[in-house]
Amino acid sequence: MGLEKPQSKLEGGMHPQLIPSVIAVVFILLLSVCFIASCLVTHHNFSRCKRGTGVHKLEHHAKLKCIKEKSELKSAEGSTWNCCPIDWRAFQSNCYFPLTDNKTWAESERNCSGMGAHLMTISTEAEQNFIIQFLDRRLSYFLGLRDENAKGQWRWVDQTPFNPRRVFWHKNEPDNSQGENCVVLVYNQDKWAWNDVPCNFEASRICKIPGTTLN
């Protein structure tokens, strides 16, 4: 009596034992395609990202908020986005964060540094006019300016060159009374301007960090 041969192939000609291997190969190919696509997108985004000038570490911040800045170029390629950490204020490629708890100057700088920033430098009247919109007139805010050696040589903490012609002191300031070698931005005499104060004086502060620019 003749015996039937066991069926060795499925309809269509594929051996049953090959099916798991084929599925595994297809799955690996799909993963490879997804990985390559992810790498291309990451590379594209990274190549578009241009950091602003100065020392900063936006990687300290999990989320960014981007604001489109005006550009003289009308084309889409000429548009620029300035990105800052959430809750920071954006102005001309920089980011600002006022904090109202009181610390000494050194403590304030350490706090800003922990966020990848420095105490605020002020280079123009426009920059000062921008930040005062977000300040409390009842408070004083440390800036990143001090006379570290008490010799009348003012320096910005982030090494920004100090321009003695671009200063915004209150009248009769700085007076260097009682070793006042640090600077606060304070509202007095109906305007915001600078006063020198002792560095162990406790005040609020403004942190500043260069933003990330996307073209």
Swiss-Prot record:
Keywords: Adaptive immunity, Calcium, Cell membrane, Disulfide bond, Glycoprotein, Immunity, Innate immunity, Lectin, Membrane, Metal-binding, Signal-anchor, Transmembrane, Transmembrane helix. The chain crosses the membrane at residues 18-38. Coiled coil: none annotated. Glycans are attached at residues 45, 102, 111. GO terms for molecular function: carbohydrate binding; D-mannose binding; immunoglobulin receptor binding; metal ion binding; pattern recognition receptor activity. It holds the Pfam family Lectin_C. It comes from the Eukaryota. Induction: By autocrine inflammatory stimuli. Residues 1-17 are cytoplasmic. InterPro entries: C-type_lectin-like, C-type_lectin-like/link_sf, C-type_lectin/snaclec_domain, CD209-like_CTLD, CTDL_fold. It is found in: Cell membrane. Ca(2+) binds at residues 173, 175, 195-196. Residues 39-215 are extracellular. Expressed weakly in peripheral blood leukocytes, bone marrow and spleen. Expression is confined mostly in monocytes and macrophage and seems to be up-regulated by IL-6, IL-10, TNF-alpha and IFN-gamma. The keyword Membrane applies. The keyword tRNA processing does not apply. Disulfide bonds join 84-95, 112-207, 182-199. It is a single-pass type II membrane protein. Calcium-dependent lectin that acts as a pattern recognition receptor (PRR) of the innate immune system: recognizes damage-associated molecular patterns (DAMPs) of pathogen-associated molecular patterns (PAMPs) of bacteria and fungi. The PAMPs include alpha-mannans on C.albicans hypheas and mycobacterial trehalose 6,6'-dimycolate (TDM). Interacts with signaling adapter Fc receptor gamma chain/FCER1G, likely via CLEC4E, to form a functional complex in myeloid cells. Heterodimer with CLEC4E; disulfide-linked. CLEC4E acts as a bridge for interaction between CLEC4D and FCER1G to form a functional complex. Heterodimer with CLEC6A; this heterodimer forms a pattern recognition receptor (PRR) against fungal infection. This is C-type lectin domain family 4 member D. It comes from Homo sapiens. The gene is CLEC4D.
